[in-house]
Amino acid sequence: MSLIEFLFGRKQKTATVARDRLQIIIAQERAQEGQTPDYLPTLRKELMEVLSKYVNVSLDNIRISQEKQDGMDVLELNITLPEQKKV
């Protein structure tokens, strides 16, 4: 690296700096284990609204959990549907 490149070298673009900072923030948030995401109650309510259009299911029959497995976030959704009556 010459003195001229050092003094007048290219500066990083603000978009690149912003992207790098955002990636750091996201990595820090993902590293915080044991915290329940804020969106789960809303997700549960919205799922209930959609499911109620098609089947009669109560909120107690919907279980949503989030955990880490092999370094990946896993969102698990369990819905217990009512038994269908045989005709």
Swiss-Prot record:
**Function, as annotated:** Prevents the cell division inhibition by proteins MinC and MinD at internal division sites while permitting inhibition at polar sites. This ensures cell division at the proper site by restricting the formation of a division septum at the midpoint of the long axis of the cell.
- List the Gene3D superfamilies hit by this protein, alphabetically: Cell division topological specificity factor MinE
Tell me which family the UniProt entry assigns to this protein: Belongs to the MinE family.
Membrane-spanning segments: none
From which lineage does this chain's organism come? Bacteria, Pseudomonadati, Pseudomonadota, Betaproteobacteria, Neisseriales
Q: InterPro entries attached here? A: MinE (IPR005527), MinE_sf (IPR036707)
User: What gene name does this entry carry?
Assistant: minE
Pfam families, sorted: MinE
For biological process, the GO terms are: cell division; regulation of division septum assembly
Record organism: Neisseria meningitidis serogroup A / serotype 4A (strain DSM 15465 / Z2491)
Q: Is Cell division among this UniProt entry's keywords?
A: yes
Keywords recorded for this protein, A-Z: Cell cycle, Cell division
Name recorded for this polypeptide: Cell division topological specificity factor
Keyword match Cell division: yes
